[in-house]
Amino acid sequence: MFHKFISTLTNKKITQTIMGTINKENIKPAMLLSAFGDACGYKNGIWEFEKSPSRIYEHYEYLGGYKNLKINKKDWRLSDDTIMHIATAIAITRPTNTDNESICKELAKAYIHSMEDMAGRAPGIQTINSVSLMTQTGMRSKVYQWNEIDFSDRAGGCGGSMRSMCIGFKYWSDEQLDTLIELSIESGRITHNNPVGFLGALVSALFASYAIRSIPPKTWPLKLMTEVMPKAREYLEKTSNSSNRNIENYEKGWNYFWNSWKSYLKLRQIPSNPDELKAANDKGIDYPVFPKDYSDYKVRENFYHSISFSGWGGSSGHDSCIIAYDALLGSADNWEEMIKRSVLHGGDNDSTGAIGCCWWGALYGFNGVPECNYEKIEYKSIIEGLAKEISN
């Protein structure tokens, strides 16, 4: 299904408009390195479901390190993360899109079609259940529309955050912020109707939009907490109803997501409001601040575990983005370090890898990345074609 959506439009390196500057050349690396992070973390199910980081590191070293990770369909197939990220990219680039609702309908269709290619890719239960409700079958009396999935306390997983990054590449400017907020939230809420889940989709897309503009990563949370979260709240109130999207049902999840980010930012001494920014500048704090022993993967593993909802770091909407962001901050432009921090851990590492490596690619392109990491990756031509479409 994917090939028919691909065009042959030419990508341009830098585009300057009245809306600002975007490094379009890095959309392709971002999309491909996201797929790398997914395929590497998944490792055909071997690494994603390995809870021991020591065993993952032993296997990684046995393979010869990142310069010898020859990603290919047989040994490193893509998981559900990238298949659904591809689906998101297809939906937002459809020529028939006229408004946000039409795009949301396309998102639902694309997610339904993506289920045809999920054998051996370990899709999440919440995604499977939601998509099945939107799928026409002979025995189903009601087929749910894209905005009819019920609210659930159990829908806070990372299924939304792992697939929304490309929305930030399509709607990257300040003038498009409202569209980014609405579409990223809905891209997650289509299957994960819980703030912990769909706000993760918002952060993934938002930070991608910052990365593709080369906005310094340490400034992202201030913009998230002061500019974007209030707008997201307004949108949820505007779309609230008395049934499946009641704002009152969202309070617990909203607060959990907000407090999780506040706690993380306090830990790293990253400002989350103007007063904290002024205080940090007055005190000369060089943030983010990491523990001295944070280069030890065991120390990172304990932290990833501590912020998770269920003990599996990165499996929810909040911690998938926090871990990916933490890895990005700690790695700077070092590709190997990004792999170690975002992918090589005992949690939901294909999702944190897909998100974090996407942001990294948007910032740094293929700088220092061995070609073997992506040259034979599954669906490479499709991903490249969609990157061109998004750049258009």
Curated annotation (Swiss-Prot):
Q: What is its EC number?
A: 3.2.2.19
Q: Which reactions are catalysed by this chain? A: N(omega)-(ADP-D-ribosyl)-L-arginyl-[protein] + H2O = ADP-D-ribose + L-arginyl-[protein]
Keyword Magnesium listed: yes
Q: Where does substrate bind?
A: K109, G159
Q: Which UniProt keywords apply?
A: Hydrolase, Magnesium, Metal-binding
Record region (Substrate)? 125-127, 192-194, 309-311, 315-316
Cofactor names: Mg(2+)
Gene Ontology MF term list: ADP-ribosylarginine hydrolase activity; metal ion binding
Comment on bound cofactor: Binds 2 magnesium ions per subunit.
According to its UniProt record, which protein family does this protein belong to? Belongs to the ADP-ribosylglycohydrolase family.
Name of the featured protein: ADP-ribosylhydrolase ARH1
Q: Which organism is it from?
A: Dictyostelium discoideum (Social amoeba)
- Source lineage: Eukaryota, Amoebozoa, Evosea, Eumycetozoa, Dictyostelia
Q: Which gene encodes it?
A: adprh
